Amino acid sequence: MGAYPFFGVPISTLNDKVQQAELFFGEQVREIRNEIVQKENVKDKFKIIETWFLQMLDESKTAPQELVEVLSKLQNQPFSKHNELLKDYPKTQKHLIQQFKKYCGLTPKAMHRIFRFNKLLEIINHKKEIIWTDIVYETGYADQSHFIKDFRNFCGFNPSIYIKNGYNESTPNFFSLDKEG
């Protein structure tokens, strides 16, 4: 779970920062880059990266099982109240937040919001007729304003523009960074 077992530092310390890959991976990162560039097949490129990451994995730094279980609950139940999903965690809420930041770089609430938004896009992308109020309540939002605020925070524009520009049909989960659509 998370990148901590690969980097060896709490991932939250890297949030909102641009870091040189050499700081974490040494000169080997240049060699890996050169190998990737030489491959034409995408599968071959990913195989190089996968092999490299598996070599870097420090099994002693993997997430505790109870943390993996919480993450799994958040992912599998994206429309539930996140506090309900966290109540069975055996330690304090502060400890849970610290562990999430260490392994994932985010709080449990932020992860849950991401999972909910991804599931929301999946629902929108598969609906032929979209009735926003139904979607708002189906996805666990208190009201339409919270739904629109979350949508705008994640993709930069409101849900109507997402539909108007056909992102739900042409390129699900990929949309223009141009806020005008």
Where are these regions (language model features)?
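Short Lys/Arg-enriched helix C-cap and helix-to-coil transition segments
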Residues: 112-113, 163-164
